[in-house]
């Protein structure tokens, strides 16, 4: 029964506006509380921002830095609200996490020119795993607004001088535009892609460079795919549905065009 409810919940969420994922999750878990943990760990939702009380720096919230109702800051490695027995990475993995946060902070400034980014690592039996989060918003709540959320989850398995990486990347995008002439348009969606690759590892620092290259390449591919395929198709659909000119003028032009075709066929 629980598996059927879980599958039904996922199917329902796939059919609803990704912009409202958080509210829809709350509604579903209020009806079936037993699904809360499974849904929170399985469903990607727009990232939320919180400020680290110790360092005064913003960081992003997700299921991977959550322990109960507390969230761990990547800058201080402390939980907010405070949690005495919260799960933190080992000393080695924490050093990698700090280095990755510094590297992706530069990446965020270069590629996003602002926004917020956070990186979280945790230990595995034969390596480690992590998540890279990036968020950029434009005029949230205004007539012209947009939000981009990138969630990159990876596993790194050590194999001597090589490491096997498995990366799952998700982009959640929301664009909204409203004006008096054309009305309102809301475009929301998400995309997920995966890749597995073996790469050379000379030292722990190589892991940060390798993951950075994988994320950079994946984001470039997903941006191009969104722009060329999804945005291009959406533009064609909107162009078919909407016309800047009056409907009467469009109908008159269409009638004239059809009359010319009939004249040529005689």
Curated annotation (Swiss-Prot):
GO terms, molecular function: actin filament binding
One Pfam family here: F_actin_cap_B
Predominant place of localization: cytoplasm
Residues that span the membrane, as ranges: none
Subcellular location: Cytoplasm, Cytoskeleton, Actin patch; Cytoplasm, Cytoskeleton
Keywords: Actin capping, Actin-binding, Cytoplasm, Cytoskeleton
InterPro entries from the UniProt entry: CapZ_alpha/beta (IPR037282), CapZ_alpha/beta_2 (IPR042276), CAPZB (IPR001698), CAPZB_N (IPR043175), F-actin_capping_bsu_CS (IPR019771)
GO biological process terms, semicolon-separated: actin cortical patch organization; barbed-end actin filament capping; cell morphogenesis; filamentous growth; mating projection actin fusion focus assembly; mitotic actomyosin contractile ring assembly; mitotic actomyosin contractile ring contraction
Gene Ontology CC annotations of this record: actin body; actin cortical patch; cellular bud neck contractile ring; cellular bud tip; F-actin capping protein complex; incipient cellular bud site; mating projection tip; medial cortex
Database matches in SUPFAM superfamilies: Subunits of heterodimeric actin filament capping protein Capz (SSF90096)
Subunit structure: Component of the F-actin capping complex, composed of a heterodimer of an alpha and a beta subunit.
PANTHER family the UniProt entry points to: F-ACTIN-CAPPING PROTEIN SUBUNIT BETA, F-ACTIN-CAPPING PROTEIN SUBUNIT BETA ISOFORMS 1 AND 2
Entry similarity comment: Belongs to the F-actin-capping protein beta subunit family.
Function: F-actin-capping proteins bind in a Ca(2+)-independent manner to the fast growing ends of actin filaments (barbed end) thereby blocking the exchange of subunits at these ends. Unlike other capping proteins (such as gelsolin and severin), these proteins do not sever actin filaments.
Annotated protein name in UniProt: F-actin-capping protein subunit beta
Protein's organism: Emericella nidulans (strain FGSC A4 / ATCC 38163 / CBS 112.46 / NRRL 194 / M139) (Aspergillus nidulans)
Gene this protein is translated from: cap2
């Amino acid at each position: 029964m629980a598996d059927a409810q879980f599958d039904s919940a996922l199917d329902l969420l796939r059919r609803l506006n990704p912009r409202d994922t958080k509210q829809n999750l709350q509604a579903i878990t209020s009806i079936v509380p037993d699904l809360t943990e499974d849904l929170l760990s399985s469903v990607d939702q727009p990232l939320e921002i919180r400020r680290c009380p110790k360092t005064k720096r913003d960081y992003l919230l997700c299921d991977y830095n959550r322990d109960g109702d507390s969230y761990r800051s990547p800058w201080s490695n402390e939980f907010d609200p405070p949690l005495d027995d919260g799960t933190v990475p080992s000393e080695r993995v924490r050093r990698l996490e700090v280095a990755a946060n510094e590297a992706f902070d530069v990446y965020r400034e270069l590629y996003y020119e602002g926004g917020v980014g956070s990186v979280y690592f945790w230990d595995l039996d034969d390596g480690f795993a992590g998540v890279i989060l990036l968020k950029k918003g434009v005029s949230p709540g205004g007539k012209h607004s947009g939000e981009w959320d990138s969630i990159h989850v990876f596993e790194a398995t050590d194999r001597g001088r090589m490491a096997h990486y498995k990366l799952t990347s998700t982009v959640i995008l929301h664009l909204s535009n409203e004006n008096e002439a054309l009305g309102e348009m809301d475009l929301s969606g998400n995309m997920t892609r995966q890749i597995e690759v073996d790469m050379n590892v000379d030292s722990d620092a190589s892991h940060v460079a390798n993951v950075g290259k994988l994320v950079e390449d994946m984001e470039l591919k997903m941006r191009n795919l969104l722009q060329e395929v999804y945005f291009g198709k959406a533009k064609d659909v909107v162009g078919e549905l909407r016309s800047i000119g009056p409907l009467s003028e469009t109908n008159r032009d269409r009638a004239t065009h059809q009359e010319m075709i009939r004249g040529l066929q005689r």
